[in-house]
Structure formats: C-alpha cells, structure tokens
C-alpha cells in the first residue's frame, strides 16, 4: 500500500513540476517535509520521491511531453536585424553641377510572430523610420529631425493576422508583409520595404512532385475614405507556377494584374512627381493623378543548382530573372522591364557565404504608380534606367558585409531614347556599404 501511495505521489509531483513556475519546487519540498513529520514517509523515502520526480520531469521535457515555458511563449518567435550603412551619392544636375552627399545610416527591425492556434497566426513588427515614408526603414545620423545625436523614430512596420483553414488556402489581413501579397523576382514595381494594407487570399497547391501552382488575390487601401477625401483602392490577382524541370533546374513564373484607382487622387508628399499630374503643383502641393494605373506584369525566374559542378566549381546556385510591366490605362511612357542574374549562396548565413547580383531596370514615366519602385534606384522615381550591382560576403553566423552600387539616368520617354552622355540625363551614382546582422 505504501509503495502504491509513493507511486501516486510521484506521478502527482511530475505533473506539478512540468510547468515553468519555480514555486512548484518549493511547494513539493514543503509537502514532502510535512509527510516526513507526520510519519507517512521516512526521510530516505522522501528524498527518493524528490530525486525520481526531478529525473522523470527532465526526461519528459526532453521528450517534448512538457514544456519548461508557457504554451504562448513556445508558440512565439522573436526576430530582428540591424544594418549599419555608409552611403555616398554623386549627382549631376542639368547645369552640369555635380553634388556629392555622404551620410551614415542605421536600420533596425524587430518582429514577433505568434501562433494563436493551429489555424491562426499573428505578426507584429516595428522598424526605424524618419517620417512615415513607406519605402524606407533607414534613419540618417544627424538627420533633419534635430541632429546632434537626437533620438530617432520607431514606427509600426506591420501588423497582420493570418488564417490557414486548409493546407492550400491562406487568408491574410492588416498591414502585411509584401511576400504575403505577391511574388516578385525584382523590385522593379514594388520596393521591398513596403508593407501594404488590406486583405489577400492565397492558394498554393502541389499537383505532382514536379509542379505546384499558386494564386494571390487582394484588395489594398491606398487612401482612406473620409468625409472630405474620397478613398482610393488597389486590386490585384497573381496566378503562378513552380516547375522542377529536373533535380537541378527549376522555373517559377507569374502573371500579375494590378489596378490602382488613382485618377483624381491627390498625390502625397511621398510621390516622386514622375507620373502625369493635373492641377497646381508646388513644393507643398503635389497635384492630382491624371490616370488610373492598370498594370499587366509577367515575371519569370530560372534557378540552376550547382551550375558549374562539371568544371569543379562549387557555386550553390545561379538564377536568371526578369519582369515586364505595361500600364494599359495610358498609351505612352507606359512600359518598363528588369533583367538580372544572381549567383553564389542562396542565403547569407555563415562565414564564407557569398553572393553576386546584377539588375538592369527601365521604367517609363507612367509605367507604374510612382509611390512604389525601389527608393534607392534614382530616389524611387519613374522615367529612369539603371544598372545595379550587389556583392555580399558572410563574416560570421548571421553577419555579412554588402556593397550595393547603382548607376542611373533620367530618360526622355519610355524606351531610354536619350544620350547617356548628355547632362539632361542627370546621371547619378549611389554607393552603399552595409554591415548586416540578424538575430
């Protein structure tokens, strides 16, 4: 009978000890001491129960039966990154006057992902940001906010809810991460810092071992509807396919249609002023958009694993990619495209990882909504052509160095029909040295 009592006691203590609260350990010691004082257990038996309880709990935690942390903590992931940047911008204006700007910058992003239950997940992120610019999470040292080591701004970067009713269906709503909204092989149309607001439904289905298909469809809020301002929306649909040609060769493609309801909407201060506007345009009044933007955007990416294995070179992957865009709502200066390649390691994770990337991009003035393109490529303007080269090298686990160089020009029209030697092209060169750390 006494052995049965000890066995029951041992099981009870194991359950009590499975949580994270350290107070349970003290409570068990007190209870065992009272049982010894009352003669229910001997001192040796009490010590045996305590030792076996500790060993059993350790074993069950290792097997995953119990967690040393509460469930909500175990289901939550904290992630972030810090980037230090030295940047030089060389500009040549129309009067042949050159200007050099050299600054230091920092970017900090911190995100939290939490699994609410088997179907729901939430994500929240904050980031450095100077003035609410949707295309940048950088802040500059000695910035216009005050300089002299003044405090820098932190803003809500994203906040979304994600629902997965089935393995092939996902619904996302809120201020979302861009990859949840659409797939893009380059930042020709969308700067990767943008976190769109609205809702998206996504489908992803594997058809066979070589083929999977996906589709995203969404409605995005551009300007809120108020009593004084008519709201504007954007809508998109993107069907796509992944196809494994063989073990080392794969293809990904998509055809995106995006409609931006912008005609008559007042441009914000973040507009670069390249799209055709109507009304009074000054340094504080940005006019209204003359057109809607109805974008047809095919995109393709070809990936080759170990492309140079035949000649003894260990290069993890080689990618070729490209995009084309046509604004169907207008008839001139309405196209753009990007072409590029990337080779080296897929990800920068450890010492010795390396990556080289090149992109050529061209955008006509009215080819895309001018609030969207990469903010580093000619300051995010349309009506441009640009070369970009990137070299990255891993210094340690989750630490890397990067060199990113842009050489860009303004263009007269949408096919780059301007002499690059002309000062009217207003060429600029942007050089960025980055130290990247992930945690």
Features from the language model and the residues they span:
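N-terminal secretory signal peptides that target proteins for export/translocation
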Residues: 1-3
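Mobile, glycine-rich extracellular loop/lid and propeptide segments
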Residues: 51, 55-63, 67, 78-84, ...
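C-terminal functional modules
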Residues: 345-349, 362-439
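N-terminal periplasmic/intermembrane-space "pro-region" immediately following the signal or transit peptide
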Residues: 5-95, 439
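Surface-exposed loop and membrane-interface regions of Gram-negative outer-membrane beta-barrel proteins
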Residues: 85-107, 113-167, 178-191, 283-288, ...
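Outer-membrane beta-barrel architecture
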Residues: 68, 109-111, 159-162, 200-202, ...
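Transmembrane beta-barrel architecture of outer-membrane proteins
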Residues: 77, 81-83, 103-107, 151-158, ...
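Signature for the C-terminal beta-barrel architecture of outer-membrane proteins
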Residues: 165-171, 179-347, 353, 360, ...
